[in-house]
Amino acid sequence: MPRSLKKGPFIDLHLLKKVEKAVESADKKPIKTWSRRSMIIPDMIGLTIAVHNGRQHVPVYVSDEMVGHKLGEFAPTRTYRGHAADKKAKKK
């Protein structure tokens, strides 16, 4: 279920401070964060945010279509390497 509108979007305060600082200084350097649960707000448009996926920080360039989604949606945590090939087919 989506979050109630009267509560507003959730964003960690430490991330919000970093975003505000980057916007006022027009800094294009990626903002490193572990907060996958924070929602993308309109102030983040045009910034690059490096979201942690459990192993490394994945750079995510924020566009206007991403507003309202969570940062973690754009940094996958699992890598799919495909199913094992059929061993019977390889022997022939």
Curated annotation (Swiss-Prot):
GO cellular component: cytoplasm; small ribosomal subunit
Gene3D superfamilies: 30s Ribosomal Protein S19, Chain A
Single GO term (MF): rRNA binding
Keywords: Ribonucleoprotein, Ribosomal protein, RNA-binding, rRNA-binding
Record SUPFAM superfamilies: Ribosomal protein S19
Similarity comment text for this entry: Belongs to the universal ribosomal protein uS19 family.
PROSITE patterns: RIBOSOMAL_S19
Full protein name: Small ribosomal subunit protein uS19
Segments crossing the lipid bilayer: none
GO biological process, one term: translation
Role: Protein S19 forms a complex with S13 that binds strongly to the 16S ribosomal RNA.
Domain of life: Bacteria
Organism of derivation: Tolumonas auensis (strain DSM 9187 / NBRC 110442 / TA 4)
